A protein has these predicted regions:
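Extracellular Ig-like/FN3 beta-sandwich strand-entry sites
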Residues: 470-472, 519-521, 557
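Beta-strand-rich interaction surfaces with strong enrichment in secreted/lumenal proteins
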Residues: 243, 461-467, 510-516, 549-550, ...
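Asp-box/BNR beta-propeller blade signature and adjacent active/binding-site loops
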Residues: 1-398, 402-426, 430-431, 452-454
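Short tryptophan-centered beta-strand motifs in secreted/extracellular beta-sheet-rich domains
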Residues: 475-477, 519-537
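Extracellular carbohydrate recognition and processing domains
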Residues: 325-333, 508-522, 546-552
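Flexible glycan-contacting loops in extracellular carbohydrate-active proteins
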Residues: 544-577
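Secretory/extracellular carbohydrate-interaction modules
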Residues: 435-513
Length: 584
C-alpha cells in the first residue's frame, strides 16, 4: 500500500474509530460484501474505501452498487452505482484510476483497459482494447515500488485449458505488453484417489507479487495438492519453470499482498479435499465430469488461512485459520441463502488492502451466504499458542460430514452448485461427569462418535482444530473416552474431520484406546519435533509411547484432528479442552 494512501486513511479516523480499529486483533467481520472476493476493493486518494458489486433483492432483481467506508472499513454506506470504471486501482504518481474488463458489460470480444485522470466516477473514461482474446478472473492492477511499471494478471481459455497471463505497462496504461505462461501440472490418478479431480479447466488464476526490484513471484492454482509458483528476475519479461510450493490448496485461488514495510501477507485455503471416488459409479455426472472436466463437489473450501513472510517469501509464519464457512454444518447446505444463491458457497478467493496501525482489510468468499469482509491485526499471525474450551460451542472447529445428496455439478438441480448437503460430525452435549446437583458448576462438552448410516458418504465423526504453526511444539486434548478408541492426527493442513485418510496422509498419527487411559477425563499431550521426525505421547503426564513421523514437512504442524474411526458403531469420546503452544 502506498504510504500516502495509508496516511489518508488514518487522517479520516475520528478518535473513537481510531480506538476501535486499534482494538481489533483476531479477524473481525465487518461486512457481507456485494460481490465475490477477488477485485471488489478500491482505495480513493482521500482514504475512502469502496467495495463494488451487485445487490440482489428478494425477487431476484439485480442492481450495480458500491459500499463506501470513511473509517478504514469499520462501517459502510451503500450507494447505487452508475459509474463506468467500477473497481479500480489508483496510481498516485499519475493521478490515474485504472481497471481492466473482459466478458462483461458488452466487452466480450477481447480485453479492455479503462482509465481516468478525473476520478472514479468519470462518465467517459478512456477505453482501449489491448488484446483480441477474452480473458477471465482479472486481478486488480499493481504498481511497482521500484519503477513506473504497472501490471495485472488474468487467464484465458482455449480448447485445452486455462492459461495464465501477465499484462504490464511502463507508461501508466497507455500501451501494454503481455506474457502467456504454459499449462501447469495436473493431478494424476494415485491412490487413495479412484477418480479424477477437476483437472481440466480448473483455472490458473495467477496471483502476482513483487518481491524486490525486478523480482516477481507468481502463485498459480491447479488440480494437485499444492500451488505451483514461478519467478521472474527481469520485471516480468521471462519466467522460470513451475515449482511446487509449501502452500497446500487444490483448485482454489490465493492472494499475495506486499505490505508497506516489505513483509508479504499470503491468503489461501490450506486444505485437502476428500479423495475422489470412482466417478463411473456416481450418479449425475457427464462423461466429461468423469474424466476431470469440471467438478462433482467441493470439499476443501470451508476454511481460509493466512501466513506472513518477513524475508521476501523465503519462509512463512502463522498458517492460521482466519475464517470458517458459517454454513459449513448446514444439513440443507445446497439451499442455504435461498433460491437466488445458486453459485459456489465457499470461502475461497481473496483480496486484501493494508490499513493503518498494522491492520488489514480482507475480502474472502463466494456467495452472499458465505463471503465476508474481515479486519485483522497482523500480530495475530505471530502468536505462538491457542486454547479452545468450547464455551463458544463449535465455532472454532470443523466437524461436518457429507450426505449422499445431489451435487449440482451440471446445473440441472435448482440449487447448490457442486455441493453436498452436510451432517454434524460433532455435537455439544452435557458433561457426563456432572453430578447433577443444582448450583454445581456444569457445562456442555463436545461429543464425537462413529455411527454407520447409509445416508453418509463416510461415517467418521471428528473435529479439526487449527493453531499457530510450529516445527516444535506441544498439543493437548482433555478427553473422556467412553468406548473403543480415538485417533489423534497432527497435520500441516486442514483435512475434513470425516476423512479416513487424514492420518495416513499427515506427519503424525496414532490411536489411544480404553486400555491406555482411564475411564475419566484425561489430558493427552503430544510433544512433537518435525525436524527429529518424532513425537512423544503422554496421558496426564505419564509417558505412553513415541510416534515416528511418516513424511517430510516443509512448513510445520498447525492442525490437530480427532476422529472416531472404530469398526462399527461407537459411543465415542467427549472433548473438554484443547491447547497448543510452540516450543522454542
Amino acid at each position: 500500500m502506498n504510504e500516502n494512501l495509508l496516511s489518508a486513511m488514518e487522517k479520516r479516523l475520528t478518535p473513537e474509530y481510531e480506538k476501535m480499529l486499534k482494538n481489533i486483533n483476531a479477524p473481525k467481520e465487518v461486512l457481507i460484501p456485494p460481490q465475490d472476493a477477488r477485485r471488489t476493493l478500491s482505495v480513493l486518494p482521500d482514504g475512502r474505501i469502496r467495495a463494488y458489486g451487485i445487490d440482489t433483492d428478494e425477487y431476484g432483481k439485480k442492481r450495480w452498487v458500491y459500499y463506501e467506508s470513511e473509517n478504514c472499513g469499520l462501517s459502510w454506506q451503500i450507494h447505487y452505482d452508475d459509474t463506468v470504471l467500477q473497481e479500480f486501482t489508483y496510481i498516485p504518481e499519475k493521478g490515474r484510476y485504472i481497471t481492466a474488463k473482459s466478458c462483461e458489460k458488452g466487452y466480450n470480444d477481447g480485453l479492455y483497459v479503462f482509465y481516468s485522470d478525473k476520478g472514479p466516477d468519470d462518465p467517459e473514461p478512456h477505453v482501449q482494447k489491448i488484446w483480441d482474446v477474452p480473458v477471465g478472473d482479472i486481478f486488480q492492477f499493481q504498481k511497482s515500488r521500484y519503477s513506473d511499471r504497472i501490471f495485472f494478471t488474468a487467464q484465458h481459455m482455449d480448447e485445452n485449458d486455462f492459461y495464465p497471463d501477465i499484462f504490464y505497462s511502463d507508461d501508466f496504461g497507455e500501451t501494454f505488453s503481455h506474457v502467456t505462461l504454459p499449462l501447469q501440472p495436473k493431478q494424476e490418478l494415485v491412490y487413495p484417489h479412484k477418480g479424477y479431480r477437476w483437472r481440466y479447466f480448473t483455472g490458473s488464476e495467477p496471483v502476482l507479487c513483487e518481491l524486490s526490484r525486478d523480482t516477481l513471484m507468481l502463485l498459480i492454482r491447479n488440480s494437485t495438492d499444492c500451488f505451483f509458483a514461478c519467478c521472474s528476475h527481469d520485471g516480468g519479461l521471462t519466467w522460470s519453470d513451475y515449482e511446487k510450493t509449501g502452500f497446500y490448496g487444490t483448485a482454489t485461488t490465493a492472494f499475495l499482498l506486499p505490505l508497506s514495510d516489505g513483509r508479504i501477507l499470503s491468503l489461501w485455503n490450506n486444505t485437502k479435499p476428500l479423495p475422489e471416488v470412482n466417478h463411473y459409479r456416481q450418479d449425475g455426472l457427464t462423461d466429461e465430469n468423469k474424466l476431470g472436466v469440471w467438478e462433482d463437489a467441493f470439499t476443501n473450501r470451508d476454511a481460509a488461512h493466512a501466513a506472513i513472510s518477513d524475508d521476501g517469501g523465503k519462509s512463512w509464519k502463522g498458517y492460521r485459520e482466519i475464517f470458517l464457512n458459517p454454513i459449513r454444518n448446514n444439513t440443507d447446505f445446497r439451499y442455504a441463502g435461498g433460491r437466488f444463491a445458486k453459485g459456489d458457497k465457499s470461502i475461497h478467493q481473496f483480496q486484501a488492502i493494508e490499513l493503518p496501525y498494522g491492520k488489514v482489510l480482507i475480502a474472502l468468499g463466494q456467495n452472499a451466504i458465505s463471503r465476508r469482509f474481515l479486519i485483522m491485526d497482523l500480530a495475530y499471525l505471530y502468536e505462538t499458542s491457542r486454547k479452545e474450551d468450547f464455551i463458544d460451542g463449535l465455532n472454532n472447529v470443523s466437524s461436518h460430514m457429507y450426505l449422499k445428496s445431489y451435487n449440482g455439478a451440471n446445473g440441472a438441480e435448482p440449487n447448490g452448485h457442486c455441493q453436498w448437503n452436510r451432517f454434524p460430525g460433532a455435537v455439544m452435549m452435557p458433561d457426563p461427569t456432572w453430578d447433577g446437583k443444582i448450583g454445581t458448576p456444569h457445562r456442555e462438552v463436545v461429543l464425537i462418535r462413529k455411527t454407520d448410516d447409509d445416508r453418509l458418504r463416510t461415517p467418521i465423526g471428528g473435529i479439526t482444530w487449527n493453531f499457530p504453526m510450529s516445527r516444535k511444539g506441544k498439543v493437548s486434548a482433555e478427553i473422556l473416552l467412553t468406548e473403543k478408541s480415538l485417533r489423534f492426527t497432527l497435520s500441516d493442513r486442514w483435512f475434513n474431520s470425516c476423512d479416513k485418510y487424514a492420518g495416513s496422509l499427515s506427519p503424525f498419527t496414532f490411536e489411544v484406546d480404553t486400555d491406555d487411559i482411564a475411564s475419566e477425563f484425561v489430558t493427552v499431550t503430544i510433544r512433537y519435533d518435525v525436524d527429529a521426525r518424532r513425537a512423544e505421547v503422554y496421558a496426564d503426564e505419564k509417558f505412553l509411547f513415541f510416534v515416528d513421523g511418516t513424511r517430510e514437512v516443509p512448513t510445520g504442524i498447525s492442525y490437530l484432528i480427532l476422529q472416531c474411526v472404530t469398526d462399527g458403531d461407537s459411543k465415542g469420546a467427549y472433548i473438554r479442552e484443547l491447547r497448543a503452544e510452540r516450543i522454542d
